[in-house]
């Protein structure tokens, strides 16, 4: 058996290893034939011989497996050495993406406000009724709720209809001063040329001690922002109504399609509505437990801005994954 073990140690490939295994443990192998002799023995002689054979078999199997693992590693290293990849091999270049126009627009919006020291805040897409409606001065039977067709789940949970809940959560968790924007996806049951059931908003909120924030501050930041986005356009603020701000305003810019002279896109008014804003209603501060504070808020639809920046008439073209359209941006 020592001679077999010595032979095993000297083997250099798996084929020779398999031949030795058959030579020792095959049907006509050395150990197999020795085990066959046991039937001719009796008593202690048989017992002693069987014990010795089992020991030899066990030792051989262990050394066989150890040698197999060793040879497999050698073979693997040889294969890896041979399989060299030629990194210089020419391949057809794939066209690079420029980014989706909606996210290009969102990034541009975010960049402006980050440079103005606004922090980015995020929140859950699935919201509860309190954060999405009630805390924003929209109680259960408020008529303004009729303006929003909402995707509801069970137990008063819903897909958020705006990113305003992020403002509520931020005011609940942070102390003043607060200076934040909330970009993200929102959901409403609407789908046509200018509406999508899933779209994107960026809302902003600034809160500080009472009387430190005025409409003048809001007007300044939004005028600066709109000139940054659309260049030398005229801007006007119109009185409006939102339950969560008082006073409230909607902001228009001179039509980017006709320069303000009047066209089909602006309904021949020369103006395009781009966002809503106002001074935060005191009832909103009461809902989150803030006293003696003031602030302003604003919100805009990213798709609306993308359509104006890229002169796109049908919002749905942004979502149809038609490369002929997307490659233009």
Swiss-Prot record:
GO molecular function, one term: tRNA binding
Signal peptide: none
Source organism per UniProt: Helicobacter hepaticus (strain ATCC 51449 / 3B1)
Quaternary structure (record): Tetramer of two alpha and two beta subunits.
Keyword RNA-binding: no
Superkingdom to which the source organism belongs: Bacteria
Pfam families cross-referenced by the UniProt entry: Phe_tRNA-synt_N, tRNA-synt_2d
InterPro entries per UniProt: aa-tRNA-synth_II, aa-tRNA-synth_II/BPL/LPL, Phe-tRNA-synth_IIc_asu, Phe-tRNA_ligase_II_N, Phe_tRNA_ligase_alpha1_bac, Phenylalanyl-tRNA_Synthase, tRNA-bd_arm
Gene: pheS
Record SUPFAM superfamilies: Class II aaRS and biotin synthetases (SSF55681), tRNA-binding arm (SSF46589)
Protein's UniProt name: Phenylalanine--tRNA ligase alpha subunit
Keywords, sorted A to Z: Aminoacyl-tRNA synthetase, ATP-binding, Cytoplasm, Ligase, Magnesium, Metal-binding, Nucleotide-binding, Protein biosynthesis
Cofactor: Mg(2+)
Location(s) in or outside the cell: Cytoplasm
Gene Ontology cellular component terms for the protein in this record: cytoplasm
